[in-house]
UniProtKB/Swiss-Prot annotation:
Record keywords, A-Z: Cell wall, Coiled coil, Peptidoglycan-anchor, Phagocytosis, Repeat, Secreted, Signal, Virulence
Lineage, opening ranks: Bacteria, Bacillati, Bacillota, Bacilli, Lactobacillales
Gene source species: Streptococcus pyogenes
Identification of the protein by name: M protein, serotype 2.2
Motif LPXTG sorting signal in this chain: 339-343
Subcellular location: Secreted, Cell wall
Length: 372
């Protein structure tokens, strides 16, 4: 009985051991199938994530290339702005110089006008004095002519009296009283002749003085007329120079106004382009955020799929695989820190604002190129 009981117990233990072995084998076989299914799903998700990452990296490289191009365009645009500002400074300097020359010429014209007025006054005064001198000269000429006529008449009368005196003296036919009277008349005639000669000499001297004064006034008049003509020529040349400077000043002001209008127009275009590019930058940022969200969803799905087998009981091989699978999300986290989801992680310079500025510079450069 004891031996039979022992055999029975041994058989039961053997049966239990076999059953347990079969259960273990079935468990291992089921785990193998599950692991194969899980590995295939992981590989598909890995490929999808890799494709998405490759596409993001490609877009990043393309955007970096566009970034470099836009930087070059921006640099050229800045060079053009600097050149325009330098041109503006030169035009302002020319405008200032032309204004100074204009004011100097205006002062010179005013001085010449004043000198011309002074010469006109002097010329009028000289002309009036010349007219007075001419009238005096004509009056003296008339007096001199009258004096000469009177002198001739007195000489004729004196000769007549001399002849009569000589005749009376020779003939002794006249009385002493008549002789004395004739002598007195002769003496008076001689005195009148001397007085008339003195007056004649004085008139002759005055006439010569007036003639000299007249000659001097004539010379002064000629000099004044020459100066007036020269001054008129200088004034005309100054006016022509003033017109030329005024024309150059007007042209410089027109160029400066055109440059200011171009500058205002450029500012307006820049503002419009900035608004457009802000909208484009916003859309680009939204697109990047959407792609980032999709990548995050894929990573979350992958992480959830890799954590599920770790909760089932298994042997050392299965637990090792589960541990290996559990380490993958941390690796994906490291990879995620290197992916340009928003541009800041992989490349701190590549931000949405920087992309907006670069795109705006590129659009502005293209528009200016089309206008040119």
């Amino acid at each position: 009985m004891a031996r039979q009981q022992t055999k029975k117990n041994y058989s039961l233990r053997k049966l239990k051991t076999g059953t347990a072995s079969v259960a273990v084998a079935l468990t291992v076989l089921g785990a193998g199938f599950a692991n194969q299914t899980e590995v295939r799903a992981d590989e598909a998700k890995k490929m999808e994530v890799k494709e998405s990452e490759k596409e993001s990296q490609y877009k990043t490289l393309a955007l970096r290339g566009e970034n470099a191009d836009l930087r070059n365009v921006n640099a050229k645009y800045l060079e053009k702005i600097n050149a325009e500002e330098e041109k503006n400074k030169k035009l302002e300097a020319i405008n200032k110089e032309l204004n100074e020359n204009y004011y100097k010429l205006q002062d010179g014209i005013d001085a010449l006008e004043k000198e011309k007025e002074d010469l006109k006054t002097t010329l009028a005064k000289t002309t009036k004095e010349n007219e007075i001198s001419e009238a005096s000269r004509k009056g003296l000429s008339r007096d001199l002519e009258a004096s000469r006529t009177a002198k001739k008449e007195l000489e004729a009368k004196h000769q007549k009296l001399e002849a009569e005196n000589k005749k009376l003296t020779e003939g002794n036919q006249v009385s002493e009283a008549s002789r004395k009277g004739l002598s007195n008349d002769l003496e008076a005639s001689r005195a009148a002749k001397k007085e008339l000669e003195a007056k004649y000499q004085k008139l002759e001297t005055d006439h010569q003085a007036l003639e000299a004064k007249h000659q001097k006034l004539e010379a002064d008049y000629q000099v004044s007329e020459t100066s007036r003509k020269g001054l008129s020529r200088d004034l005309e040349a100054s006016r022509e120079a003033n017109k030329k400077v005024t024309s150059e000043l007007t042209q410089a002001k027109a160029q400066l106004s055109a440059l200011e209008e171009s500058k205002k127009l450029s500012e307006k275009e820049k503002a419009e382009l900035q608004a457009k590019l802000d909208a484009q930058g916003k859309a680009l940022k939204e697109q990047l955020a959407k792609q980032t969200e999709e990548l995050a969803k894929l990573r979350a799905e992958k992480a959830a799929g890799s954590k599920t087998p770790a909760t089932k009981p298994a042997n050392k091989e299965r637990s090792g695989r589960a541990a290996q699978t559990a380490t993958r999300p941390s690796q994906n986290k490291g990879m995620r820190s290197q992916l340009p989801s928003t541009g800041e992680a992989a490349n701190p310079f590549f931000t949405a604002a920087a992309a907006t500025v670069m795109v705006s510079a590129g659009m502005l450069a293209l528009k200016r190129k089309e206008e040119n």
